[in-house]
Amino acid sequence: MLRAGVSTACLYPRVVEEALYDLALSGVSNVEIFINSHSELRRSFVDTMARLLHRFDMTCASLHPFTCEIEPTMLFSNYPRRADDYLEYCRHYFSAMQ
């Protein structure tokens, strides 16, 4: 089944937690959370967003990294250390998605 959703990025430049709250109040039940900074990957911040999702019975369908614009350079160059470092950094995103 196809489910429509809304990204917190649609409300940029509002900070992500305010955007998520606004979407919740608007009755949006399926969201993408667009991470805009490294600090938004901290466990305490992620836990706050998870509580908000739970409170409003929302589903996060995807977590969109702010680093997506550099992924081609980080992953597909002839510099293996850069790719290794970037994959290590991505662990922050993977952890946030759990």
Label every PLM stretch briefly.
Residues 1-98:
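N-terminal pre-domain/capping segments
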